Every structure is written in structure tokens, then in C-alpha cells.
Amino acid sequence: MHLRKWAGVTTLVAAMGCCYAEASTPRVILVQPSGSQVPANLLRISIRFAAQVEGPVLPRIALLRADGSEIQEPFLEQELWSPDGNVLTIMMHPSRVKSGTNARAALGPILSVGEEVALAINGYPIKRWRIGPNDEAGPVTAAWRVSAVLPKSRQPLVVTLDEPIDGRDAGYLGIADAGGRRVAGRASLAVGESAWAFTPNAPWRAGEYKLIVRSTLEDPAGNRLGSRFETPIDSPPGPAADAVVRFAVFSRRSRAPR
């Protein structure tokens, strides 16, 4: 990897999040986390390809520092593919993410606060990040903000999260009506996975609703609702439980003061 390659594609990466450097490099549609900053204890990365990729991919992937040098042994040697074969999830080596391990003592942490790194395929960067502080707490649903939507519309409901969540976890949130029936619709993540948007298949009806969040929802550092990825042995996490965020759909007229 040479600095020439880094400098030659950074503008494209910043604008599009992917590159098409050469014919042998598989076409990348999206890399998650998709934001510009990730925590130093980042646990996983997902890459969506335009089509299925033949052969092992992990040997072709590297993490590069700003000077072009390669970070040594950052990944767990396992390729986790989606059922359609288009999305590859890569795990950062947990023994180097967690503190107090032999691997971390020998090789050091994978990422350091303040540096910039690039994820590369065949030596060409496909995504850059700035490294921020460790994320040591899971998502806090009490801090989420739910947008207002109007009845008789299919207006998207947007939930602003307190932090980014894992890019593969959009389906870990769902909407139920007052009778507990699941509301059918399409969910997606936006704004660097820090917002969840839901568009119902049928128009909203006025009334009470619940946003149900699975206990296994994670942030990019592997922290879950009410628990941390790195938990002391003498302080095990409590039992996992789904979270509920209540909201209501009302017309503008019913909201107006009397």
C-alpha cells in the first residue's frame, strides 16, 4: 500500500463511501459504520457488495493508518455472510478490543483515539474513519426522540437515537399498536446509523403505539441495552429485557390547545 493510493481515492471515499479502483476489486455499495467517527473499541464492520464475491475476502482486506502502514492482525479470521451472500461482517479481534488480555498486551489495541484509519480492499481504501473515545455504555432508549406523524398518512416515523447502533440491527426495532399487533412496514437506518426510520405499509391510525426494542440490540462496540461488551467477572449483567418506547399519533387539531 502506497500513499499515492490513499491520496488518490480519499475524495471519492469521502463523497461516496466506496471506490472502483480496478476491475478485480469487488464493487462496494456500503460500509458500516457509515459515519465519519467510530469508537476505539469498535467490534464489527459490515461491507455490502453489489454482488456475491467469489473466494475468500478477508485476506484481501486491511486496516491502514494515515501513513499507509497496515495495522497488524486486527480481525478475527472468520467471514460472516448474510443469507443473500452480499453482506460481509468482519469482527475485530475481541482479545485486542478487551482490556487486560494477553493479545492486547502483546500487540496493543487495534485502534487509538485521535488517529485516522482506512478500510481497504486489494490495497484501495473503501472507507475512512476518525477514531473517537471508547464507547463503554449500551444504547439508552430513554434518551431517544420519536418524531411526530399524522394519521391517515404514511409519513415516515423517525427515531433519533442517543448513539449509532450496529448497521445490521434495523430489524431489532418494531412498532406495535395499542392492541399489541405488529405494524407492518419498512425500516432503515440513517445518519450514520444514529436514526431509525419506519414507513408503514398502511396509513397511520390515530392512537397509542409502542416502539419495541429487542434486548439484543447492539452498538458498534458490542454494548447492548443495559449491558456492556466488556463486563467485569464479578459484576455480571442482569437478565436481558426488551425495551418499550411509547408514543401516540394525533391529528394537528387534537393537539391544538383549547
Give the ranges of each region predicted by the language model.
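Acidic, low-complexity Ser/Thr/Gly/Pro-rich repeat segments typical of extracellular/periplasmic
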Residues: E22-R258
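Detector for methionine-enriched segments
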Residues: M1, M16, M91-M92
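Bacterial N-terminal signal peptides
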Residues: V9-G17
